Amino acid sequence: MKGFAMLSIGKVGWIEKEKPAPGPFDAIVRPLAVAPCTSDIHTVFEGAIGERHNMILGHEAVGEVVEVGSEVKDFKPGDRVVVPAITPDWRTSEVQRGYHQHSGGMLAGWKFSNVKDGVFGEFFHVNDADMNLAHLPKEIPLEAAVMIPDMMTTGFHGAELADIELGATVAVLGIGPVGLMAVAGAKLRGAGRIIAVGSRPVCVDAAKYYGATDIVNYKDGPIESQIMNLTEGKGVDAAIIAGGNADIMATAVKIVKPGGTIANVNYFGEGEVLPVPRLEWGCGMAHKTIKGGLCPGGRLRMERLIDLVFYKRVDPSKLVTHVFRGFDNIEKAFMLMKDKPKDLIKPVVILA
């Protein structure tokens, strides 16, 4: 089969591999729609998770089941499914501790384009199909559905980690597609004021659509100064980091009130340390909580997010600015994600 792959750090291209085979609890899926992610860019061009050779990329897909193992009960060939970016092994101690994202080791629930071939192939393997796949209602368009496996679950996880109370003031640092879903998640969880930090007009407009009450453009001056001015020196109850380099951690610590929460769902692809400013952290005693989490995966998570879309609580299709058709255009969409033109939020490739 054909696949678009990371050949080595800094190099991508098309390769041929054997079609995968399912184990007894697994499924083989043909992608119907895929989307490249900034994480793929970090992995390839920054070598963020180390060297990978001839690894098929991609972890955002909806697809059609083509084959299942003998023990799979709930899915059959022909079923349309949402495939989470995180597909844990559910029989691990990490799952029992409540951290399925790390089943088998830190970040080990993230398998696609990390420890095994991803979804940018003509077929791909899904472990533990009954626990990881979710049925896709026919009413949800593919462009919207393919935002569920990563963008929605990651952005919403930022809002979950932030412990948002009703009426709270929340800052979302970075309003790419993950940050926009963090804005939507903060609104759903009852935030009163949502301050979105970004500069590109297409993202600013989307942030307002999803619930941002204020916009801070980092090109207009230091983020912390602008947010402290907006809040009359009080700061925010929670800051969700959804973009930026390592220095954004210091910004988040500076703008959060004592007792507030910094929630990170950003993939830091470079740098050895994340700075925490001593004074703004109250010399270590400000009761400011820093959390970072890999997005939840698995069937139940996908089913709940599907319900949010199906019942029109959230419309993730607003993230999609570029739609390509045909398998060979995966490379074009991938490079678009790397180059990030001003009119881009998220590209999608339709394969159905």
From Swiss-Prot:
UniProt-annotated binding residues for NADP(+): I175, G176, P177, V178, G198, S199, R200, Y218, V265, N266, Y267, K340
Keyword field contains rRNA-binding: no
Keyword Transmembrane helix in record: no
Record key words, sorted: Metal-binding, NADP, Oxidoreductase, Zinc
Gene3D superfamilies referenced in this protein's UniProt entry, alphabetically: Medium-chain alcohol dehydrogenases, catalytic domain, NAD(P)-binding Rossmann-like Domain
Reaction(s) this enzyme catalyzes, per UniProt: propan-2-ol + NADP(+) = acetone + NADPH + H(+)
InterPro entries on file: ADH-like_C, ADH-like_N, ADH_Zn_CS, GroES-like_sf, NAD(P)-bd_dom_sf, PKS_ER
Binding site for Zn(2+): C37, H59, D150
Cofactor binding: number and manner: Binds 1 zinc ion per subunit.
A Pfam family this chain is assigned to: ADH_N
Cofactor (UniProt): Zn(2+)
EC class of the enzyme, as a word: oxidoreductase
Segments passing through the bilayer: none
Disulphide bond pairs: none
E.C. numbers: 1.1.1.80
PROSITE patterns per UniProt: ADH_ZINC (PS00059)
Gene Ontology molecular function: isopropanol dehydrogenase (NADP+) activity; zinc ion binding
Cited SMART domains: PKS_ER
Taxonomic superkingdom: Bacteria
Quaternary assembly: Homotetramer.
Function: Alcohol dehydrogenase with a preference for medium chain secondary alcohols, such as 2-butanol and isopropanol. Has very low activity with primary alcohols, such as ethanol. Under physiological conditions, the enzyme reduces aldehydes and 2-ketones to produce secondary alcohols. Is also active with acetaldehyde and propionaldehyde.
Family the entry assigns: Belongs to the zinc-containing alcohol dehydrogenase family.
Protein name: NADP-dependent isopropanol dehydrogenase
Organism per entry: Thermoanaerobacter brockii
